[in-house]
């Protein structure tokens, strides 16, 4: 599927007219999605039914398009595409050239929640464009087709105030020859770009992904506030995220099996990397492939406290031929500004011991607190 996007300026004017909402997402997002007064609840059993429900919510009773949407939406998805996911798993290198499949939420600001039922699955993505007040929860996304058409699992373009929570996103961390740069067949798990800001990514289980996520599409797309918390990343290659400018706060995440690089802080971005657990990781915190506009990071209360911990947790470092900075001395290179939201991180050890009981689908949206660490 291909879509023409309105200009960023037009999208921002549309979004600016909408009131903010006030959920506690544990991060920069403050949206309840469709969980507001006047919401219409719908159930969908397929990608097409989700598309049809969203299209119907964008017009009034006379069929005239309503700016920002006619009413808030709560969509419960109960479909199962395990057969497509299993077929893709058997033909990994055949996915790149297939048509991308996805639900597009475009110019919708009334509030929308898409939430999967336990046991549901999707071989299609959710693409959020020029919208705001969007929540995606308890969705299981596997082996997205259409890498050549930017077939991300979740894509957020020019859309503030989005919450991506308690999902599972997976593919195969594998390179297929014949694709650009011998790249994998699959695109990103969660890309946040083109002016998107105030986004929270929480309690997701992301595994087998080569390019996990962008924070910014280019060296000029640099202004955003993002929070990543209580996510599990296993057997992933890079972009955790690839940060082009802006602010990234990452706390209480578990990183196990980074095969390329983790945080790549570029274009003078600033990252607060707090109370996370790292193991079996190559270049977990770095700045590279960015001439001299390196970003900075503040390292706080992670399981790694000094280079003497690297061997214990199997942390290794590589040195590319291009200019770069690695956190191989495990020291902060900058100071993160004050944070506008309240949060209470648990210890990195608790993340290691307990987070798997809370992150991903089928966990009833449960959250990890200090009381659970005992």
Swiss-Prot record:
<dbReference type="GO" id="GO:0030570">
    <property type="term" value="F:pectate lyase activity"/>
</dbReference>
<feature type="disulfide bond">
    <location>
        <begin position="350"/>
        <end position="373"/>
    </location>
</feature>
<feature type="disulfide bond">
    <location>
        <begin position="93"/>
        <end position="176"/>
    </location>
</feature>
<dbReference type="InterPro" id="IPR045032">
    <property type="entry name" value="PEL"/>
</dbReference>
<comment type="pathway">
    <text>Glycan metabolism; pectin degradation; 2-dehydro-3-deoxy-D-gluconate from pectin: step 2/5.</text>
</comment>
<dbReference type="GO" id="GO:0005576">
    <property type="term" value="C:extracellular region"/>
</dbReference>
<keyword id="KW-0479">Metal-binding</keyword>
<keyword id="KW-0732">Signal</keyword>
<feature type="binding site">
    <location>
        <position position="150"/>
    </location>
    <ligand>
        <name>Ca(2+)</name>
    </ligand>
</feature>
<keyword id="KW-0456">Lyase</keyword>
<dbReference type="InterPro" id="IPR002022">
    <property type="entry name" value="Pec_lyase"/>
</dbReference>
<keyword id="KW-0106">Calcium</keyword>
<feature type="active site">
    <location>
        <position position="239"/>
    </location>
</feature>
<protein>
    <recommendedName>
        <fullName>Pectate lyase 2</fullName>
        <ecNumber>4.2.2.2</ecNumber>
    </recommendedName>
</protein>
<comment type="similarity">
    <text>Belongs to the polysaccharide lyase 1 family. PLADES subfamily.</text>
</comment>
<feature type="binding site">
    <location>
        <position position="191"/>
    </location>
    <ligand>
        <name>Ca(2+)</name>
    </ligand>
</feature>
<dbReference type="InterPro" id="IPR011050">
    <property type="entry name" value="Pectin_lyase_fold/virulence"/>
</dbReference>
<keyword id="KW-1015">Disulfide bond</keyword>
<feature type="binding site">
    <location>
        <position position="187"/>
    </location>
    <ligand>
        <name>Ca(2+)</name>
    </ligand>
</feature>
<comment type="function">
    <text>Involved in maceration and soft-rotting of plant tissue.</text>
</comment>
<dbReference type="InterPro" id="IPR012334">
    <property type="entry name" value="Pectin_lyas_fold"/>
</dbReference>
<feature type="binding site">
    <location>
        <position position="152"/>
    </location>
    <ligand>
        <name>Ca(2+)</name>
    </ligand>
</feature>
<dbReference type="GO" id="GO:0045490">
    <property type="term" value="P:pectin catabolic process"/>
</dbReference>
<keyword id="KW-0964">Secreted</keyword>
<feature type="signal peptide">
    <location>
        <begin position="1"/>
        <end position="22"/>
    </location>
</feature>
<dbReference type="GO" id="GO:0046872">
    <property type="term" value="F:metal ion binding"/>
</dbReference>
<dbReference type="Pfam" id="PF00544">
    <property type="entry name" value="Pectate_lyase_4"/>
</dbReference>
């Amino acid at each position: 599927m291909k879509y023409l996007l309105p200009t960023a300026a037009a999208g921002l004017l549309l979004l600016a007219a909408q009131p903010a909402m006030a959920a506690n997402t544990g991060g920069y997002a403050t949206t309840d999605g469709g969980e507001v007064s006047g919401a219409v609840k719908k159930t969908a059993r397929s990608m097409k039914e989700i598309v049809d429900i969203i299209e119907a919510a964008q017009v009034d009773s006379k069929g005239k398009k309503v700016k920002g949407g006619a009413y808030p939406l709560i969509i419960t998805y109960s479909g199962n595409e395990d057969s497509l996911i299993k077929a893709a798993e058997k033909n990994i290198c055949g996915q790149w050239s297939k048509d991308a499949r996805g639900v597009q939420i475009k110019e919708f600001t009334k509030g929308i929640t898409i939430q999967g039922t336990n046991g549901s699955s999707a071989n299609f993505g959710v693409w959020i464009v020029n919208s705001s007040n969007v929540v995606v929860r308890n969705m299981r996304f596997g082996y997205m087709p259409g890498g050549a058409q930017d077939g991300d699992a979740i894509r957020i373009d020019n859309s503030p105030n989005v919450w991506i929570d308690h999902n599972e996103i997976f593919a195969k961390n594998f390179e297929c020859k014949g694709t650009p740069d011998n790249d994998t067949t699959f695109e990103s798990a969660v890309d946040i770009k083109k002016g998107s800001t105030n986004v929270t990514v929480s309690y997701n289980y992301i595994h087998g992904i080569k390019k996990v996520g962008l924070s910014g599409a280019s060296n000029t797309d640099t202004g955003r506030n993002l929070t990543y918390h209580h996510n599990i990343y296993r057997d992933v290659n890079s972009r955790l995220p690839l940060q082009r400018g802006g602010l990234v706060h990452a706390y209480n995440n578990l990183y196990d099996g980074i095969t390329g690089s983790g945080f790549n802080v570029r274009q003078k971005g600033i990252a607060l990397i707090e109370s996370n657990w790292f193991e079996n990781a190559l270049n977990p915190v770095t700045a590279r492939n960015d001439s001299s506009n390196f970003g900075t990071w503040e390292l706080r209360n992670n399981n790694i406290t000094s280079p003497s911990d690297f061997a214990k947790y199997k942390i290794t470092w590589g040195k590319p031929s291009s200019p770069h900075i690695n956190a191989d001395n495990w020291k902060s290179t900058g100071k993160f500004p004050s944070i506008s939201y309240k949060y209470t991180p648990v210890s990195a050890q608790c993340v290691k011991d307990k987070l798997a009981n809370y992150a991903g689908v089928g966990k009833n949206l449960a959250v990890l607190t200090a009381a659970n660490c005992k």
